Regions:
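N-terminal presequence-like segments and adjacent domain-start helices
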Residues: 1-34, 43-49, 66, 73, ...
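Short, aliphatic-rich beta-strand segments
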Residues: 53-60
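A short local structural element in Rossmann-fold oxidoreductases
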Residues: 69, 80
Length: 97
């Protein structure tokens, strides 16, 4: 395991213990995002937070918002497989201004 990954896990554990579960989870998602969505999608889309039970993903063009809408179930399934638990019920996709 790399030092970077160990540090990320230590920071996540600290944030969870301090009651910042969403921040810790967002960090976990960000660390595996490119592996789950692929480098091309990761170039144009990134997880930015949560709204209710949905993961908020920001994209750089409306076309990517449409594409991610079609891929939502696949992305959520990939995140669940990577992290070992469900992370959100849906995706809320926003276009960066």
């Amino acid at each position: 395991m790399s030092d970077e990954r160990r540090l990320g896990e230590a920071i996540g554990a600290y944030l969870r213990s301090a009651g910042h579960e969403e921040v810790a989870l967002l960090g976990e998602i960000a660390r595996c995002w490119e592996d789950v969505v692929g480098p091309k999608v990761a170039e144009h889309a990134s997880p930015v937070g949560f709204r209710g039970h949905d993961l908020v993903v920001a994209v750089d063009h409306p076309g990517w918002a449409t594409q991610l809408g079609f891929l939502a179930a696949t992305i959520l399934g990939g995140l669940e497989a990577e992290l070992g638990r469900a992370v959100a019920q849906g995706l809320e996709i926003t276009v960066r201004r």
